[in-house]
């Protein structure tokens, strides 16, 4: 339907943005915006989070005419968003609105509007952002994944951005982690353990190689 077409148009726009994707939101929406920005940045789309309140005190300078802004507000009436919305409209920076209310201030001013489906918050009082934040996060993740596909982002690219932790180890190549034998302290089989103890600290690898007269590695 209309939302599917809008989603596709947003992906097209973000895939061709010349600068960065700027995520902004206040309160719980701000935390969701941060996570979406982090997911995009780690999957091939240059993205950052800008706090809407801080934006009014100088951080608007972080947003350039080459960027695109995704503004998140469940109600679409977050007062702290007013200055950043005015700024992007003034300089004709693309504004993508993520909101539950198409007829809200944010919904009316967005160049593209992604409307969350009707929902009731899981909070017993129907007040605390729960269902809305989960739906927004899912929508943001969907955008990030669609951009991955559009840009042809590969496992190798993913590995470049994730050098640490289990993911980094799984995607790293041996030649990226290995140290040449010339960098490792070595001893011969005839040397004493005292020599080994003295040699190990010089390489800072916590080990020592044992080599034969021809320099071939016999063991560690």
Show where each model-derived region lies.
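Short, basic, glycine/proline-bearing loop/turn elements
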Residues: 1, 68-73, 182-184
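An N-terminal, well-structured beta->alpha segment
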Residues: 1-15
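Flexible, glycine/charged-enriched surface loops at secondary-structure junctions
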Residues: 5-8, 153-158, 210-213
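Short acidic active-site motifs
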Residues: 6-10, 55-59, 195-196
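Glycine-rich phosphate-binding loops that contact phosphosugars or nucleotide phosphates
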Residues: 15, 20-26, 30-138, 144-147
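Internal, active-site/partner-interface "lid" segment
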Residues: 108, 122, 149-179
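A glycine-centered beta-loop-beta connector
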Residues: 177, 200-203, 208-220
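The conserved cystathionine-beta-synthase
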Residues: 187-204
